[in-house]
Amino acid sequence: MARPRLHDAALRARLLDVASRAISQHGEGAVTVRSVAADAGTSPSAVYALYGSRDELVAAVSAEGFRRFAAHLATVDRTADPRADLAALGRAYRGFALADPHFYAVMFARGVRPGAGRPRAVEEATFLVLRDAVARLVPDPTSAADVALGLWGLVHGLVSLELAGLVPGDGAERSARYDATLAAVGPGLVRRTGT
Protein backbone atom coordinates (compact mmCIF):
# COMPACT_ATOMS: atom_id res chain seq x y z
CA MET A 1 0.00 0.00 0.00
CA ALA A 2 1.35 3.41 -0.98
CA ARG A 3 2.13 5.89 1.74
CA PRO A 4 -0.37 8.78 1.79
CA ARG A 5 0.97 12.14 0.74
CA LEU A 6 1.30 14.46 3.69
CA HIS A 7 1.39 17.64 1.63
CA ASP A 8 -0.48 18.15 -1.62
CA ALA A 9 -0.55 20.63 -4.48
CA ALA A 10 -3.30 22.60 -2.77
CA LEU A 11 -1.11 23.22 0.27
CA ARG A 12 1.82 24.14 -1.98
CA ALA A 13 -0.38 26.70 -3.76
CA ARG A 14 -1.73 28.03 -0.45
CA LEU A 15 1.79 28.54 0.92
CA LEU A 16 2.79 30.34 -2.28
CA ASP A 17 -0.30 32.54 -2.04
CA VAL A 18 0.35 33.39 1.63
CA ALA A 19 4.00 34.23 0.93
CA SER A 20 3.00 36.29 -2.13
CA ARG A 21 0.48 38.29 -0.10
CA ALA A 22 3.01 38.88 2.69
CA ILE A 23 5.51 40.20 0.16
CA SER A 24 2.88 42.35 -1.58
CA GLN A 25 1.76 43.92 1.69
CA HIS A 26 4.97 44.16 3.69
CA GLY A 27 7.98 43.32 1.52
CA GLU A 28 10.26 40.29 1.40
CA GLY A 29 11.33 40.69 5.02
CA ALA A 30 7.83 39.71 6.12
CA VAL A 31 8.32 36.17 4.84
CA THR A 32 9.39 33.73 7.52
CA VAL A 33 8.77 30.01 7.42
CA ARG A 34 6.92 30.18 10.73
CA SER A 35 4.62 33.08 9.75
CA VAL A 36 3.81 31.63 6.32
CA ALA A 37 3.04 28.24 7.85
CA ALA A 38 0.82 29.78 10.54
CA ASP A 39 -1.09 31.93 8.04
CA ALA A 40 -1.58 28.89 5.79
CA GLY A 41 -2.82 26.78 8.69
CA THR A 42 0.02 24.27 8.59
CA SER A 43 3.35 23.55 10.22
CA PRO A 44 6.81 24.92 9.38
CA SER A 45 7.84 21.38 8.48
CA ALA A 46 5.29 21.46 5.64
CA VAL A 47 7.01 24.55 4.21
CA TYR A 48 10.37 22.78 4.38
CA ALA A 49 8.93 19.59 2.89
CA LEU A 50 7.40 21.43 -0.06
CA TYR A 51 9.94 24.20 -0.68
CA GLY A 52 13.12 23.16 1.10
CA SER A 53 13.89 26.55 2.59
CA ARG A 54 12.65 30.09 3.00
CA ASP A 55 14.87 31.15 0.09
CA GLU A 56 13.32 28.54 -2.20
CA LEU A 57 9.85 29.70 -1.17
CA VAL A 58 10.79 33.28 -2.05
CA ALA A 59 12.29 32.01 -5.34
CA ALA A 60 8.95 30.32 -6.06
CA VAL A 61 7.20 33.64 -5.41
CA SER A 62 9.63 35.27 -7.86
CA ALA A 63 8.87 32.63 -10.48
CA GLU A 64 5.14 33.12 -9.93
CA GLY A 65 5.65 36.85 -10.32
CA PHE A 66 7.30 36.39 -13.70
CA ARG A 67 4.46 34.10 -14.80
CA ARG A 68 1.92 36.74 -13.77
CA PHE A 69 4.00 39.46 -15.42
CA ALA A 70 4.20 37.57 -18.73
CA ALA A 71 0.45 36.93 -18.61
CA HIS A 72 -0.17 40.62 -17.90
CA LEU A 73 2.00 41.73 -20.83
CA ALA A 74 0.32 39.18 -23.09
CA THR A 75 -3.03 40.92 -22.50
CA VAL A 76 -1.81 44.03 -24.33
CA ASP A 77 -3.73 44.19 -27.60
CA ARG A 78 -1.75 43.73 -30.78
CA THR A 79 -2.74 46.36 -33.33
CA ALA A 80 -1.65 47.30 -36.83
CA ASP A 81 0.81 49.81 -35.32
CA PRO A 82 3.84 47.99 -33.84
CA ARG A 83 5.31 51.21 -32.40
CA ALA A 84 2.09 51.94 -30.54
CA ASP A 85 2.08 48.34 -29.34
CA LEU A 86 5.58 48.75 -27.90
CA ALA A 87 4.48 51.89 -26.07
CA ALA A 88 1.46 50.01 -24.73
CA LEU A 89 3.75 47.23 -23.49
CA GLY A 90 5.89 49.85 -21.75
CA ARG A 91 2.84 51.28 -20.01
CA ALA A 92 1.69 47.77 -19.04
CA TYR A 93 5.15 47.09 -17.58
CA ARG A 94 4.93 50.23 -15.47
CA GLY A 95 1.35 49.50 -14.43
CA PHE A 96 2.26 46.02 -13.22
CA ALA A 97 5.16 47.34 -11.15
CA LEU A 98 3.23 50.22 -9.61
CA ALA A 99 0.24 48.03 -8.77
CA ASP A 100 2.34 45.71 -6.60
CA PRO A 101 5.78 47.21 -5.94
CA HIS A 102 6.86 44.72 -3.25
CA PHE A 103 6.08 41.76 -5.49
CA TYR A 104 7.85 43.45 -8.40
CA ALA A 105 10.90 44.11 -6.22
CA VAL A 106 11.17 40.45 -5.24
CA MET A 107 10.98 39.41 -8.89
CA PHE A 108 14.05 41.46 -9.72
CA ALA A 109 15.90 41.36 -6.40
CA ARG A 110 19.52 40.38 -6.57
CA GLY A 111 19.95 36.72 -5.86
CA VAL A 112 16.26 35.84 -6.03
CA ARG A 113 15.81 33.61 -9.03
CA PRO A 114 13.31 30.94 -9.99
CA GLY A 115 15.56 28.05 -8.91
CA ALA A 116 17.81 25.38 -10.32
CA GLY A 117 15.12 23.33 -12.03
CA ARG A 118 13.71 26.30 -13.94
CA PRO A 119 16.61 28.69 -14.27
CA ARG A 120 15.49 31.15 -16.90
CA ALA A 121 12.25 29.95 -18.45
CA VAL A 122 9.96 32.19 -16.43
CA GLU A 123 12.01 35.32 -17.12
CA GLU A 124 12.31 34.38 -20.78
CA ALA A 125 8.53 34.22 -21.18
CA THR A 126 8.38 37.88 -20.16
CA PHE A 127 11.24 38.84 -22.45
CA LEU A 128 9.74 36.93 -25.39
CA VAL A 129 6.57 39.04 -25.30
CA LEU A 130 8.73 42.14 -25.76
CA ARG A 131 11.09 40.55 -28.29
CA ASP A 132 8.18 39.37 -30.43
CA ALA A 133 6.72 42.89 -30.44
CA VAL A 134 10.09 44.35 -31.45
CA ALA A 135 10.48 41.73 -34.20
CA ARG A 136 7.56 43.33 -36.03
CA LEU A 137 9.85 46.35 -36.56
CA VAL A 138 13.25 44.66 -36.57
CA PRO A 139 13.23 41.49 -38.67
CA ASP A 140 16.76 40.30 -37.80
CA PRO A 141 16.39 38.04 -34.71
CA THR A 142 19.69 39.08 -33.11
CA SER A 143 18.97 42.76 -33.60
CA ALA A 144 15.41 42.32 -32.34
CA ALA A 145 16.72 40.67 -29.17
CA ASP A 146 19.26 43.48 -28.67
CA VAL A 147 16.61 46.18 -29.14
CA ALA A 148 14.22 44.33 -26.82
CA LEU A 149 16.92 44.16 -24.15
CA GLY A 150 17.57 47.89 -24.55
CA LEU A 151 13.87 48.69 -24.25
CA TRP A 152 13.55 46.41 -21.23
CA GLY A 153 16.48 48.21 -19.61
CA LEU A 154 14.87 51.56 -20.37
CA VAL A 155 11.47 50.75 -18.88
CA HIS A 156 12.96 48.86 -15.94
CA GLY A 157 15.24 51.77 -15.14
CA LEU A 158 12.43 54.31 -15.35
CA VAL A 159 10.15 52.18 -13.19
CA SER A 160 12.92 51.56 -10.65
CA LEU A 161 13.57 55.29 -10.39
CA GLU A 162 9.87 55.94 -9.91
CA LEU A 163 9.50 53.25 -7.25
CA ALA A 164 12.50 54.73 -5.43
CA GLY A 165 10.75 58.12 -5.37
CA LEU A 166 13.25 59.73 -7.71
CA VAL A 167 10.81 60.83 -10.42
CA PRO A 168 9.24 64.14 -9.42
CA GLY A 169 5.59 65.06 -9.72
CA ASP A 170 2.24 63.50 -8.99
CA GLY A 171 0.98 60.34 -10.68
CA ALA A 172 -0.18 62.11 -13.84
CA GLU A 173 3.11 64.02 -14.17
CA ARG A 174 5.15 60.85 -13.68
CA SER A 175 3.03 59.07 -16.31
CA ALA A 176 3.62 61.93 -18.74
CA ARG A 177 7.37 61.83 -18.09
CA TYR A 178 7.41 58.07 -18.58
CA ASP A 179 5.52 58.30 -21.88
CA ALA A 180 7.71 61.19 -23.08
CA THR A 181 10.89 59.25 -22.33
CA LEU A 182 9.60 56.16 -24.11
CA ALA A 183 8.62 58.30 -27.11
CA ALA A 184 12.02 60.02 -27.19
CA VAL A 185 14.32 57.04 -26.62
CA GLY A 186 12.42 53.98 -27.83
CA PRO A 187 12.33 54.88 -31.54
CA GLY A 188 16.07 55.62 -31.43
CA LEU A 189 16.78 52.09 -30.25
CA VAL A 190 14.73 50.71 -33.11
CA ARG A 191 16.31 53.03 -35.72
CA ARG A 192 19.86 52.04 -34.72
CA THR A 193 19.22 48.61 -36.22
CA GLY A 194 18.62 50.10 -39.67
CA THR A 195 14.83 50.02 -39.76
Report each predicted region and the residues it spans.
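Alpha-helical DNA-contacting segments of helix-turn-helix folds
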Residues: 23, 58-65, 107, 115, ...
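Short hydrophobic clusters on alpha-helical segments that form packing/core surfaces
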Residues: 15-23, 65, 69, 93
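Amphipathic alpha-helical packing segments from all-alpha helical-bundle domains
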Residues: 114-139, 145-150, 172-187
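Helix-turn-helix
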Residues: 14, 18, 22-56, 60
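Amphipathic C-terminal alpha-helical segment
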Residues: 153-170, 185-194
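Hydrophobic alpha-helical connector segments
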Residues: 60, 74-103, 123-127, 144, ...
